[in-house]
Design a protein with these regions (language model features):
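Buried hydrophobic packing segments
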Residues: 47, 51, 70-74, 236-246, ...
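Conserved active-site and cofactor/substrate-binding residues in soluble primary-metabolism enzymes
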Residues: 8, 29, 42, 65, ...
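Adenine nucleotide phosphate-binding catalytic loops in nucleotide-utilizing enzymes
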Residues: 157-287
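Short, compositionally biased "basic patch" segments
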Residues: 33-54, 98, 254-268, 287-296
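Phosphate-binding loop of NTP-binding sites
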Residues: 1-160, 167, 173
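Active-site beta-alpha connecting loops in nucleotide-dependent enzymes
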Residues: 264, 282-324
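Cofactor-binding loop segments of dinucleotide-utilizing enzymes, especially the Rossmann-like FAD-
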Residues: 36-37, 62, 163, 256, ...
Length: 324
């Protein structure tokens, strides 16, 4: 019909009838929330698969990550023992208040949908407030992302993961002080101290990922993902860390679950058409474009870029043609 999959309709109706239904449906079940500008759906799919090796899981695997979609997922998974939920950045504070999550996964923050969310420091402050409001919550945070590091910097229970930060244009200053951020190959720090005199610097990670495998506090394991791209290796590292540290999932089972994901709501899927193999990639902001273009197979016969904004195509086509 062209009207979408309808994943939020039930939640919209239920939320209108009972404004407190999210908390009621949550029922105190152990929950993990996954948030960030890019990688939410992929990380949630990997994490849900890992937690599912030990528990029954309810999740919004269609990417419906606002209130209505979350409520729909909770209604569909009423018999599940655990909740693994992708949550829009601006919805995290009240979703956390409703579900009191056991774990919060913080991926990255960059410019996205400025007409809706405004400047990203607003999101950083909102997420930081959610962390402060739930001091017992385990936070799995990307220490390579300056903004997410600020969100989790004062958390009492935090695991730092070196998941990478491909796009740096939105984190040239400290979100708390405005001080310039200096970067080296494997470190960053703000030249201006925090209000209490502490240095704001990249924390030392206990989890990480490189081209060969995933690094844990006790071991290094191979990591052979079906999904392309450096960013997805970082997503996998955070998903695996959350499953192991947050829910006691066996490390090897968590890795296998992440490796088994080859399609996320159509993203990264491969289509065979008229004798050709077509790989679909999605990008919706500058950071996503940078990552998607890095995944392009330079030996491919062709590259097609499609946009849902008609005003973009005429302006962009000559530049793309010139770059061929």
């Amino acid at each position: 019909t062209g009207r979408g999959a309808g994943g939020m309709i039930g939640g919209l109706v239920a939320g209108a009838i009972d404004p407190n239904i999210m908390a009621s449906l949550g029922g105190g079940r152990p929950a993990v929330l996954v948030t960030g500008t890019n990688g939410k759906s992929t990380t949630t799919r990997m994490l849900a698969g890992a937690v599912r090796t030990k528990y029954a899981v309810a999740t919004n695997d269609g990417g419906d990550n606002m209130d209505a979609g979350i409520i729909s997922a909770l209604m569909a998974g009423k018999d599940a023992s655990h909740l693994v939920l992708e949550v829009d950045e601006l919805h995290v504070p009240h979703v956390a208040d409703s579900l009191n999550p056991q774990v919060l996964v913080l991926l990255n923050l960059t410019r996205d949908q400025l007409d809706r969310v405004g400047e990203i420091n607003k999101i950083e402050r909102a997420l930081r407030g959610a962390v402060e409001a739930h001091p017992d919550m385990l936070v799995i945070a990307n220490c390579d992302d300056v903004l997410m590091t600020s969100v989790a910097y004062d958390a009492k229970n935090v695991i730092w993961v070196s998941a990478g930060a491909g796009w740096l244009g939105d984190s040239v200053t400290c979100p708390r002080t405005g001080g310039h951020v200096v970067r080296t190959e494997d470190d960053w720090y703000a030249v201006k101290p925090l209000a209490d005199g502490r240095e704001f610097r990249r924390p030392q990670p206990t989890w990480g990922v490189d081209k060969r495998g995933i690094i844990t506090p006790t071991a290094k394991r191979p990591l052979n993902l079906a999904l392309p791209g450096r960013a997805n290796r970082g997503n996998a590292a955070q998903a695996i860390a959350a499953a192991v540290a947050g829910f006691g999932v066996d490390l090897d089972k968590a890795i296998a679950a992440a490796e088994s994901i080859d399609d996320v709501a159509g993203r990264y899927s491969t289509i065979h058409w008229k004798g050709r193999e077509i790989r679909l990639l999605l990008a919706k902001n500058p950071a996503g474009w940078q990552e998607a273009l890095s995944m392009v197979d330079r030996s491919a016969d062709g590259l097609v870029i499609a946009t849902d904004d008609a005003s973009v195509a005429p302006a962009t086509a000559p530049e793309l043609e010139a770059a061929r």
